Amino acid sequence: RLIMFVGDPSSSNELDRFSVCPFSNDTVKMIFLTRENRKHDFYTLDTMNRHNEFKKSIIKRPVVFITHGFTSSATEKNFVAMSEALMHTGDFLIIMVDWRMAACTDEYPGLKYMFYKAAVGNTRLVGNFIAMIAKKLVEQYKVPMTNIRLVGHSLGAHISGFAGKRVQELKLGKFSEIIGLDPAGPSFKKNDCSERICETDAHYVQILHTSSNLGTERTLGTVDFYINNGSNQPGCRYIIGETCSHTRAVKYFTECIRRECCLIGVPQSKNPQPVSKCTRNECVCVGLNAKKYPKRGSFYVPVEAEAPYCNNNGKII
């Protein structure tokens, strides 16, 4: 079957006319993980109350939302590895957001790249969905906003940003932190703060840049880490280099969760200091503890080609 589109599929009128990628709450599925329950069962907004965690009157665990990017899913191995690393590190409630139906990559896998603009058009709606779940956590389960952190890759980074904007509109306050893993560049590079992930979307917004084409070189957060100058990651071959570099952001962050050594961010300048001379007042470790370091701004991060990727044994003096 041949599907042909005439006009701009990013236009809301065109999307409505063709129903390319219709959004509803049922197009977003969730996996809830804790140390006690690691089953990758899918839940919807209507069925989430069946999970043991939501049979409680109060949820005391810190909450981490993980949102995948275009053409991916919550069960993709890199996100499963991230969730496992988080559960090993702390007693979290992890909410893995699966929005592949809203990106049309589930129904039309062979044509998935045709639907990028349609997926972009649904990012704010998926963000609003996450905000709705956050509202439920705060109001029904007494989870403080300071206990909620969002992690998103590529389009998932912008989805997380839109969720951060929406909870503020709902007068819930700000999320503790949003971590954008190589936020998608196409359709977002020139957008102002209201139309992309932005430093005002949470109390602390951490951005990892790993691909200059699929991602963006633009500063977006409280801290922006330009890993290997933000492009051409070591160990990524030329032919699939951009996709590999784009995905490396997820792998880097997972290693930062999993291991004691950190990826060290050195303040960007014409003559950046070597990581061997980094101090806690000048440099920042990428990862869950980044906001404990006082420095803000843009940082250069040297990495190795293989895991655990850290340079200088990941030590700050």
Swiss-Prot record:
This protein's record includes keyword Lipid metabolism: yes
Name of protein: Phospholipase A1 1
Organism lineage string: Eukaryota, Metazoa, Ecdysozoa, Arthropoda, Hexapoda
Propeptide residue span(s): 8-17
Natural source organism: Dolichovespula maculata
Enzyme class name: hydrolase
Signal peptide: 1-7
Molecular function via GO: phospholipase A1 activity; phospholipase A2 activity
Chain positions carrying an annotated carbohydrate: N25, N229
Principal subcellular localisation of the protein: secreted
